[in-house]
UniProtKB/Swiss-Prot annotation:
Region (G4): 153-156
Residue(s) carrying 5-glutamyl glycerylphosphorylethanolamine: 301, 374
Family named by the database record: Belongs to the TRAFAC class translation factor GTPase superfamily. Classic translation factor GTPase family. EF-Tu/EF-1A subfamily.
Region annotation (G3) ranges: 91-94
The protein's name: Elongation factor 1-alpha, oocyte form
Domain tr-type G span(s) in chain numbering: 5-242
UniProt binding sites for GTP: 14-21, 91-95, 153-156
One example GO MF annotation: GTP binding
Organism per entry: Xenopus laevis
InterPro entries xrefs: EFTu-like_2 (IPR004161), G_TR_CS (IPR031157), GTP-eEF1A_C (IPR054696), P-loop_NTPase (IPR027417), T_Tr_GTP-bd_dom (IPR000795), TRAFAC_GTPase_members (IPR050100), Transl_B-barrel_sf (IPR009000), Transl_elong_EF1A/Init_IF2_C (IPR009001)
Presence of keyword Cytoplasm: yes
Length: 461
């Protein structure tokens, strides 16, 4: 066994009919964790449904159906391997809660793969004012996904098929609009592909002899290649934030007989170790960590990305709950937010939003109503430049700086300090009406909280 490959998370974005599912299905199918038996079963079912209907998308539809029904499917089905990386597709749109997931997401994507359809009239539909292509790309950039790969799909259905002119036209237009969003097109590979036929997916296509390959320039090093797989292999692996202070948002708190209280969550930044004195905000409870476990094995330290359970001393299940954040009591401990300033982008709200609006915010694992206390300024969502002070209201498409006040105690952080705790989705009318990034937090000095005896004792050591 060689050295373990690096794990990378990607998110696949693009318009409904761009062929995302087929393209993603193709990668998972050819390089992924789906075993032969499952594939044969899918193929047989597809053949029974009318033989031509088997496409790679079928694989994804089966997986999606299982995901939607709440069956925890074997997560390896959403993984595939490249020469350098193990890649996990953390979400693909078309899923009801895609936008919310992308924000509160179980993990941050290291790279977004944007699929645009090259077929006649299709590209135009996806890129039109209300097409989702723009919204998804804007969202990815706003949420800190700084690497982008573009697959110009369905090259087999251009006029004429595999048209160089069409590919160049689309590349030019997409470059212009990702540049407006904030991406630098020189760093973005554009790959002409057919997710169904497999052109330029894993192997260079013989149908496009004119395509000499993609080239990118970036300060971390230039790269070039021909296929989509090679482009994925050129992703720059993220620096995992182990050096930052600990932040661990709780997903659940269990009471386990004979052990005691066990909070469960994902380490977002920093390191969690047995023996540490942790503080939970906004509950303001401090105690000692007795042990840390992942997949029923004791750990000496848990790192960013690890989903762990940890046993805490002298704390009841009533003291802490989902949405609380654990941190190191001696190193920038988490605190309750009295209020915070955020940059929000209104995505789809049927009316006008004015001061006093109080929707529910989903930020990390917290789910709390927050009031838009003050609309400070309307800004240009691309450049961030101020357009007007104290706007009376905001509508779909607007970006603004707002002051927000949580309706109940809540712990959030600025995006620049702790990214996963600094981005949120605004939910109303069962949909995501806005997304936001926290610029600054007014932290509330807590009145004396509960400090357990074990914490006091361990603190004296």
């Amino acid at each position: 066994m060689g050295k373990e490959k690096i794990h990378i998370n990607i998110v696949v974005i693009g318009h409904v009919d761009s062929g995302k599912s087929t393209t993603t299905g193709h990668l998972i199918y050819k390089c992924g964790g789906i075993d032969k038996r499952t594939i044969e079963k899918f193929e047989k079912e597809a053949a029974e449904m009318g033989k031509g209907s088997f496409k790679y998308a079928w694989v994804l539809d089966k997986l999606k159906a299982e995901r939607e029904r709440g069956i925890t499917i074997d997560i390896s089905l959403w993984k595939f391997e490249t020469g350098k990386f193990y890649i996990t597709i953390i979400d693909a749109p078309g899923h009801r809660d895609f936008i919310k997931n992308m924000i509160t997401g179980t993990s941050q994507a290291d790279c977004a793969v944007l699929i645009v359809a090259g077929g006649v009239g299709e590209f135009e539909a996806g890129i039109s004012k209300n097409g989702q292509t723009r919204e998804h790309a804007l969202l990815a950039f706003t949420l800190g996904v700084k690497q982008l790969i573009i697959g110009v799909n369905k090259m087999d259905s251009t006029e004429p098929p595999f048209s160089q002119k069409r590919f160049e036209e689309i590349t030019k237009e997409v470059s212009a609009y990702i540049k407006k969003i904030g991406y630098n097109p020189a760093t973005v590979p554009f790959v002409p592909i057919s997710g169904w036929h497999g052109d330029n997916m894993l192997e260079a296509s013989t149908n496009m002899p004119w395509f000499k390959g993609w080239k990118i320039e970036r300060k971390e090093g230039n790269a070039s290649g021909v296929t989509l797989l090679e482009a994925l292999d050129c992703i720059i692996p993220p620096q995992r934030p182990t050096a930052k202070p600990l932040r661990l948002p709780l997903q659940d708190v269990y009471k386990i007989g004979g052990i005691g209280t066990v909070p469960v969550g994902r380490v977002e930044t920093g390191v969690l170790k047995p023996g540490m004195i942790v503080t939970f905000a906004p509950s303001n409870v401090t105690t000692e960590v007795k042990s840390v476990e992942m997949h029923h094995e004791a750990l000496q330290e848990a790192l960013p990305g690890d989903n762990v359970g940890f046993n805490v001393k002298n704390i009841s299940v009533k003291d802490i709950r989902r949405g609380n954040v654990a941190g190191d009591s001696k190193n920038d401990p988490p605190m309750q937010a009295g209020s915070f300033t955020a940059q929000v982008i209104i995505l789809n709200h049927p009316g006008q939003i004015s001061a006093g609006y109080a929707p529910v915010l989903d930020c990390h694992t917290a789910h709390i109503a927050c009031k838009f206390a003050e609309l400070k300024q309307k800004i240009d969502r691309r450049s961030g430049k101020k357009l007007e002070d104290d706007p009376k209201f905001l509508k779909s498409g607007d970006a603004a700086i707002v002051e927000m006040i949580p309706g109940k105690p809540m712990c959030v952080e600025s995006f620049s300090d702790y990214p996963p705790l600094g981005r949120f989705a605004v939910r109303d009318m069962r949909q995501t009406v806005a997304v936001g990034v926290i610029k600054g937090v007014d932290k509330k000095a807590a009145s004396s909280g509960k400090v357990t005896k074990s914490a006091v004792k361990a603190g004296k050591k």
